Amino acid sequence: XTAVQTLDISPVGRVEGDLDSXSILEYFRNAILARFGGGLGKYAPFTGTNYEIGVTISGDKDPQAGLVVTPRESTTXGLNEPFYIKPYVSXGYIPHEDGALAHXIEVDGVVVEAYTQAELFR
């Protein structure tokens, strides 16, 4: 049995208005690398007040390449939603059948796919 390591990097705070994706991804990327390093091959779940991230860190693969940004239900009024960051494994991750791709954004030349909450949580 593999031990699961958890690192609390709260508080991240809420993201209201325009999502500064580059800053958030860089924050999580740095937190992952600082805690686990780049070659440990760990699956490292990170949780914060409004965000989660889980990426497989192996060899020279950049953790940023394994992220999905997903909308989270907001308890505040308005059109802007806070966001979750959840794992995305390009070699085999399949969204729920009843879900549809919401949109895609590009962060530093990397396309980060955004899915609705219903697609990742049933």
From Swiss-Prot:
A GO term for molecular function: cytochrome-c3 hydrogenase activity
Membrane-spanning residues: none
This protein's record includes keyword Repeat: no
Presence of the UniProt keyword Cell wall biogenesis/degradation in the record: no
Cofactor(s) it depends on: Fe cation
Entry EC number(s): 1.12.2.1
Coiled-coil regions listed in the entry: none
Taxonomic superkingdom: Bacteria
Keyword line: Iron, Oxidoreductase
Catalytic activity: 2 Fe(III)-[cytochrome c3] + H2 = 2 Fe(II)-[cytochrome c3] + 2 H(+)
Name listed for the protein in its UniProt record: Cytochrome c3 hydrogenase large chain
Organism of provenance: Acidithiobacillus ferrooxidans
